[in-house]
């Protein structure tokens, strides 16, 4: 029913966040709740699961992560809580690569995943995550193209107290700047951050 929520993160716990969307607080279970900052505006991709016990919202930072969650749910023996626990225990790229390579032993290290369930995950999903892995690899390559001076500047801005999200918002603009040193990038970055 919901595709995504865009709102202010008001509560962060180890298992869920609360997102205020136009005055309504939605409790959203997330594999990575601490990736969000309290008070920040966030776009969270939502999967609504309806069961006899109630309606539960699960939220993800990207459509790809939501897609991986849905793929895990399609595996016999994996419910929403198990899928969320698996995604919380490992970064999505490593998880998808392990499934694509048929690494049953690797998958058994996740909470609630025994050898039988791990084998079922590989059986059901192997070959279905190639596009996902390729997209993540492309994203990693694009992020790896940042110059050492720009990378130092981004780390310095975080050390100055700016959040990762704030720094991420200006990274593309800083990549377009013709600068040779980290100091030049920092000055431009501060100007962009103070403009908000």
Curated annotation (Swiss-Prot):
Renumbered residue ranges of the record's region Domain II: 62-140
Biological process annotations from GO: DNA recombination; DNA repair
Signal peptide: none
Free-text comment on this protein's domains from its UniProt entry: Has three domains with a flexible linker between the domains II and III and assumes an 'L' shape. Domain III is highly mobile and contacts RuvB.
Gene3D superfamilies per UniProt: 5' to 3' exonuclease, C-terminal subdomain, DNA helicase RuvA subunit, C-terminal domain, Nucleic acid-binding proteins
HAMAP family: DNA_HJ_migration_RuvA
Keywords: Cytoplasm, DNA damage, DNA recombination, DNA repair, DNA-binding
Cross-referenced Pfam families: HHH_5 (PF14520), RuvA_C (PF07499), RuvA_N (PF01330)
Subunit structure: Homotetramer. Forms an RuvA(8)-RuvB(12)-Holliday junction (HJ) complex. HJ DNA is sandwiched between 2 RuvA tetramers; dsDNA enters through RuvA and exits via RuvB. An RuvB hexamer assembles on each DNA strand where it exits the tetramer. Each RuvB hexamer is contacted by two RuvA subunits (via domain III) on 2 adjacent RuvB subunits; this complex drives branch migration. In the full resolvosome a probable DNA-RuvA(4)-RuvB(12)-RuvC(2) complex forms which resolves the HJ.
Family: Belongs to the RuvA family.
Example of a GO cellular component annotation carried by this entry: Holliday junction resolvase complex
Subcellular localization: Cytoplasm
Lineage summary: Bacteria, Bacillati, Bacillota, Bacilli, Lactobacillales
InterPro entries (UniProt xref): DNA_helicase_Holl-junc_RuvA_I (IPR013849), Hlx-hairpin-Hlx_DNA-bd_motif (IPR003583), NA-bd_OB-fold (IPR012340), RuvA (IPR000085), RuvA_2-like (IPR010994), RuvA_C (IPR011114), RuvA_C_sf (IPR036267)
Annotated segments matching region Flexible linker: 141-149
GO molecular function: ATP binding; four-way junction DNA binding; four-way junction helicase activity
Highest taxon in the source lineage: Bacteria
Annotated spans, Domain I: 1-61
Name the UniProt record assigns to this protein: Holliday junction branch migration complex subunit RuvA
SUPFAM superfamilies: DNA helicase RuvA subunit, C-terminal domain, Nucleic acid-binding proteins, RuvA domain 2-like
Function field: The RuvA-RuvB-RuvC complex processes Holliday junction (HJ) DNA during genetic recombination and DNA repair, while the RuvA-RuvB complex plays an important role in the rescue of blocked DNA replication forks via replication fork reversal (RFR). RuvA specifically binds to HJ cruciform DNA, conferring on it an open structure. The RuvB hexamer acts as an ATP-dependent pump, pulling dsDNA into and through the RuvAB complex. HJ branch migration allows RuvC to scan DNA until it finds its consensus sequence, where it cleaves and resolves the cruciform DNA.
Region called Domain III, residue ranges: 149-196
């Amino acid at each position: 029913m919901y595709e995504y929520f865009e709102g202010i993160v008001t509560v962060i716990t180890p298992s869920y966040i609360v997102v205020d969307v136009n005055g309504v607080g939605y409790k959203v279970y997330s594999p990575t709740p601490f990736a969000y900052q309290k008070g920040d505006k966030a776009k969270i991709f939502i999967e609504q699961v309806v069961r006899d016990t109630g309606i539960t919202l699960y939220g993800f930072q990207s459509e790809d992560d939501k897609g991986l969650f849905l793929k895990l749910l399609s595996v016999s023996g994996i419910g929403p809580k198990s899928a969320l626990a698996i995604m919380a225990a490992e970064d999505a790229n490593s998880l998808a690569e392990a499934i694509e390579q048929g690494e049953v032993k690797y998958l058994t290290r996740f909470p609630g995943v025994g050898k039988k369930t791990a084998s079922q995950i590989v059986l059901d999903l192997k070959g279905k995550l190639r596009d996902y892995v390729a997209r993540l690899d492309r994203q990693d390559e694009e992020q790896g193209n940042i110059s050492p001076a720009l990378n130092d500047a981004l780390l310095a801005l975080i050390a100055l107290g700016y959040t990762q999200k704030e720094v991420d918002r200006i990274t593309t603009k800083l990549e377009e700047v013709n600068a040779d040193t980290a100091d030049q990038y920092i000055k431009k970055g501060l100007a962009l951050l103070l403009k908000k």
